Amino acid sequence: SVPPVLVGASLGGIAGMIAQGEYAKAGRRGFAALVLVDITPQMNMEGVQKILGFMASNLEEGFASLEEAADTISRYMPGRPRPKNLSGLAKNLRLRENGRYYWHWDPRFITGTQKPQGSREPERLQMAARSLKIPTLLVRGRDSDLVTVEAARQFAEIVPHSEFIDVANAGHMVAGDKNDIFTSAVLDFLTRMAPAASTS
């Protein structure tokens, strides 16, 4: 069977790095290629806390309408134009029987004893990154709160064969901020990496 290519944003990228690291330790191939979207082993803790704060906002009370949710997102990301069509936002919210909208993620992800910490197991992430031998692309939002220029530089040192794209006018949510540029970059990488991935 053909191994998959993993495109992981934020927590998905962390999972991808760790999974590939475990594959490498076991002497298995794992993924054909890896695309990390605004995530590196070295994370800016202020940015992590800002993201967690946003995720925790209105967690219990929810929103009275999609418009209220859109206003909250606009305050968190003032540089992103507020969408006129909120149908896309509706996919990230759940309408409960009480008529209010709630984020689609499990509240225990934020409030539970196993809530994410940006500094959790940084050594494991570093080791996983060092084990990356497959084609790897790091896509950073130039306005990211999470991945600094220095963090991207350190990643390039740890994974010298990796490629790097810095997307202007994009924050941590690169695909949402500049979807056309993000998609083109990923497709270009996959097209060029296909021969290498098939023989690695």
PLM regions with names:
Residues 1-47:
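Conserved hydrolase catalytic core segment
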Residues 167-183:
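Catalytic histidine-centered segment of alpha/beta-hydrolase-like enzymes
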Residues 45-50, 150-151, 177:
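Short aromatic-enriched loop/helix-cap "lid" or pocket-rim segments at secondary-structure transitions
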Residues 62-120:
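Conserved alpha/beta-hydrolase catalytic His-Asp/Glu region
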Residues 95-157, 163-166:
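Conserved serine/cysteine hydrolase catalytic core
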Residues 185-196:
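C-terminal alpha-helix
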Residues 36-78:
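Internal catalytic or translocation cores that form aromatic/hydrophobic pockets or channels
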